[in-house]
Amino acid sequence: MDIFQAVPLHLQIPRIEIPKMASAASTPSTMSSSQTWSSSRPQVPISYQQLRKLSEWGIEALKDTSPTVVGQDRFESQEILIDNDYRTDFLNSHEEDSRWSKQVDLIMKQLPYGDLDAFVDEFHYEIISSQLLTSSIASHHQLFTVQKSILNFNKENTLSIHNAEGKTIPTKYGQLLISGKKFYLQRTIPYMFTILTARKAFRKMLYKRHLPRSSLMSLLMIAVYLALQQEYFHAKYSKYTALLNLRQMNAALQSVDKLIYRYHLTYKELTIYKPIALTENRGLRSDEARTLTLLTDVLTCTVDQLFHKLNIASSNILPVVNAVQLTDYISIYNVDLQSLYQMIRTVESLDITQKLERLQYMRKFFLCCLLSINYTDPLKKCEIALVLKRIFPGYHVEKTSDIERFQIISKQLYTLTQGISSLLPVLHHYKHLLLSVYGSTIEKEDPESKEAVITQSIYRLSELQRYLMKQDKTSTELSSHLIDELNGIIQIWNIDYKHNSHEQLKPPKCSPRPSSQRVFSGGLNLDIVKTTSDIPVVVDSFPKLTSLVDVLEVDETGSDIEKEHEELVYGTENDQETASSNDSKFSRFTDDQLRHELNQRILNLSIENKKSRENLRKQKSFELMNRKIENQKKGRPQIDCKGLFNSEESIPVLFELKQFLNRRSD
């Protein structure tokens, strides 16, 4: 709002001339500046008789040149608003006005609500870029970093305060009180009252002559500056708090969502395994049944509490939400209000899967409500308002200021974050249930395998402690059970150690060979020396072949010679016995062991095959080169006129010679 809009201006008001009529006996009446301005108020010197005659005009008296369109020749510009003396005072003070205008620009540099659009965009981006509106398992990549963020609030407004605890410090943002690690800031100048009072005073100053206005304008501008700064600080702090609480709520909600997802997977695995065990005429073991019961209780308690907390937060935020934008967002993210109404108002007992679906629906609706918060006032009369009134009986539209709106949002987000954080200790306390389903099986895909082993060991030790507390006598059965449990725990750590040592020697999953031996299809491999020197390092880490490998002869076209002569090959009895023994050996392997054995053999064969092909190519290149040299010595004509050593077979040899000469020159 421009509070200095009443600065004197030189206005242009046209002079009106009344044309002479045939029936009128008077002369044309004109309006001049000398007749229209007085010290009290302007007066128009037109008599009642002239006005009466003006009313007798008809349409036939008006012509195209009548003063009906602005800009015609009948209009003449003349300055009549301000008299000469008053205009002279302002012309003489032109330099002073320019000095005041610079001060006004500095005062208006930081307006309280100038960055509201940027805050709304950053608030929306913080919600959309999270994993909550899409898949909770998808990888999260930050699209871009906000350069001028609302969260840079502390950096811009740092205060160097030393030994000021318990004292009240006057600042331009208000009275500052420091108590421990908390800061209390109290507003000292009301915003709207100060702005309206200053505007009224500036307007009155325009009609006061010969009044020293410098001191009064300085006082008013200081008051306006302090009011703007305090409003700017409080508005930005409310936006800063809302965005900070939103970020904390996002982090807490994502952590809970990931843990609930893992609990649900374990629950589904047990519920799928249970009917299979019953079909085989054997029920679940006691530990598996106890784990399934605990998982059901933990999931039910956590999901129900989180759903009701989101429901309360949504109903409290709805009064400051723009209902039209909420309609757009729930259609984008496929949230059906009818289904939401049925999920909230249902009284039937739901299973775990249905409760999780209800929780995801409410979470999406809550985030859509946050996306619908902007700087416009919520609408009272719209179609969706009636539907929201049925879903949330306490729904009503409130007309609040921007600061109050951000404070409501910040308070609800903080309360929701505290409620979500109270669920995390429960989920972490029963995290060992996720690892007790398959006994000593360790999740290989878990990046925190060390933590998984520790958690599983603690769980088994706690179970062993609970078992020992129930025993009152020492017996052989108790000793054997204790030894078996301890051996099982030791076996877990041995499996983890072997798994880690195998991972160090295991090539990447994307290729059956190590990264140093990865072959890129870029043509003929030129660096023979460096390639062959790297092979023994890899070969030593794997068992070598005991039998020789027959290398097929390859012609110049690259096709195998033996492929053209296909014939049946019959195995001997010795081969059949070896195959049967291998079958019996492999039948005892698990799928992971078979896959590992197959990968090892493929890797060994590929290394040996590559080495033999490189030796064959090298030998062939030397033979071709020697043949050309012998033909040249005997004086035999060359078939082609090309130079020596320019064929593809001679490239590896030339590459080696070049490296050898470079080492000699160094």
From Swiss-Prot:
Gene Ontology biological process terms, A to Z: peroxisome inheritance
Keywords, comma-separated and alphabetical: Glycoprotein, Membrane, Peroxisome, Receptor, Transmembrane, Transmembrane helix
Keyword Protease attributed: no
GO molecular function per UniProt: myosin binding
GO cellular component: peroxisomal membrane
Membrane topology: Single-pass membrane protein
Source organism, top-level taxon: Eukaryota
Subcellular location: Peroxisome membrane
UniProt key word Membrane: yes
Region ranges (Disordered): 562-586
Residue positions the entry lists as glycosylated: N374, N582, N604
InterPro entries, A to Z: INP2, Myosin-bd
Membrane-spanning residues: 214-230
Biological role: Required for peroxisome inheritance.
Similarity annotation: Belongs to the INP2 family.
Name of the protein described by the UniProt record: Inheritance of peroxisomes protein 2
